[in-house]
């Protein structure tokens, strides 16, 4: 099973991914945690470029770098592990590009979706958890952090990202909005319940 965690910066998605990973392992499942961009030697080098505060990256270049990292991750890591029966848990996947570059960068949701399909060889998560928080809360959570290039974009940018994610939720049955303002335990309880239902179906 392939599960992706999405959300604006500061949403707590990485925490929830780790909790689900620990839970599945406790049930005897084989689990692989991955992150985007990254997860491969090439992907980690691309990650360094994308998050470098000293670089001025054109929005189309930014998108193509994300797609290159994703394409490598799918072929080198995701496909082989799914074939071996692993639960693959992704800290961001294709919907991040749709929200950040397609929506917030105004490249266009349809354009990015088409390019995503090519980059991923039409691989899409079985479940997407979007951890939703207001942008004001996100900015509060990020204020004491050493911010990377994308995290420095500010609240207006994050608002565009969030709005695009919320639109995506209306288009897909396997895209679940989780209220990230609840306690960590309550958020995880909701995620665990959804995963267990999918495992039983």
UniProtKB/Swiss-Prot annotation:
GO terms for cellular component: cytosol. SUPFAM superfamilies: P-loop containing nucleoside triphosphate hydrolases. GO terms for molecular function: ATP binding; dTMP kinase activity. Disulfide bonds: none annotated. It catalyses: dTMP + ATP = dTDP + ADP. The keyword Nucleus does not apply. ATP binds at residues 7-14. Coiled coil: none annotated. It holds the Pfam family Thymidylate_kin. Its EC number is 2.7.4.9. One of its GO terms (biological process) is dTDP biosynthetic process. Keywords: ATP-binding, Kinase, Nucleotide biosynthesis, Nucleotide-binding, Transferase. Belongs to the thymidylate kinase family. Phosphorylation of dTMP to form dTDP in both de novo and salvage pathways of dTTP synthesis. This is Thymidylate kinase. It comes from Thermosipho africanus (strain TCF52B). The lineage of its organism: Bacteria, Thermotogati, Thermotogota, Thermotogae, Thermotogales. The gene is tmk.
């Amino acid at each position: 099973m392939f599960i992706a965690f999405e959300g604006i910066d500061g949403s707590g998605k990485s925490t929830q991914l780790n909790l689900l990973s620990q839970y599945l392992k406790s049930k005897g499942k084989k689990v692989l945690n991955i992150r985007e961009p990254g997860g491969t030697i090439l992907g980690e080098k691309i990650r360094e470029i994308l998050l470098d505060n000293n670089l001025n990256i054109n929005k189309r270049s930014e998108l193509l770098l994300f797609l290159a990292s994703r394409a490598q991750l799918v072929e080198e890591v995701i496909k082989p592990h799914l074939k071996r029966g692993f639960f693959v848990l992704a800290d961001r996947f294709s919907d991040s590009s749709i929200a950040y570059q397609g929506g917030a960068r105004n490249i266009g949701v349809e354009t990015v979706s088409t390019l995503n399909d090519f980059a991923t060889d039409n691989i899409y998560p079985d479940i997407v958890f979007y951890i939703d928080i207001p942008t004001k809360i996100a900015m509060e959570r990020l204020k004491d952090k050493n911010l990377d290039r994308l995290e420095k974009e500010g609240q207006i940018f994050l608002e565009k990202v969030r709005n695009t994610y919320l639109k995506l939720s209306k288009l897909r049955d396997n895209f679940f909005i989780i209220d990230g303002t609840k306690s960590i335990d309550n958020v995880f309880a909701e995620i665990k319940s959804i995963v267990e239902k999918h495992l039983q179906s």
